[in-house]
């Protein structure tokens, strides 16, 4: 982990978060009962990390430096959506034949994240109630 690579990841993350904001704002007119901005971000981020990650592998059609892969895949995609990393890691598990692990990754992540959100909500609601 070099300082230069950290700077590239940070720059990509800044770009990714800006893109996330822009897409979220652009999606506001179509958002109704569903958070379409988030859905669009998660789907396009997952597609981008799968496309770029595969195309730029050492054995891919357009191999690039590890630094550029860090910039795009961890920086931009990570700032844009963490769901893309989750999706890629789940696909990697399935491609390696670890279907049970992939299933646990999906179900476990969703269940644990929902539980964590609930716990965070409950803790904050308790604090809010005490200060009212």
Regions found by a protein language model. Name each.
Residues 1-132:
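Membrane-interface helix-loop junctions in multi-pass transporters/channels
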């Amino acid at each position: 982990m070099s300082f230069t690579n950290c700077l590239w990841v940070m720059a990509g993350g800044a770009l990714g978060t800006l893109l996330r904001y822009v897409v979220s704002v652009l999606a506001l007119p179509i958002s109704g009962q569903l958070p379409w901005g988030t859905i669009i971000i998660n789907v396009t981020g997952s597609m981008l990390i799968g496309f770029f990650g595969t195309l730029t592998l050492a054995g891919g059609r357009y191999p690039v430096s590890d630094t550029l892969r860090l910039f795009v895949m961890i920086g931009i995609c990570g700032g844009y959506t963490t769901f893309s990393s989750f999706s890629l890691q789940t696909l990697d598990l399935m491609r390696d034949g670890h279907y049970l692990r992939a299933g646990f990754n999906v179900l476990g992540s969703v269940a644990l994240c929902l539980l964590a959100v609930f716990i965070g909500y409950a803790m904050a609601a308790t604090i809010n109630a005490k200060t009212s």
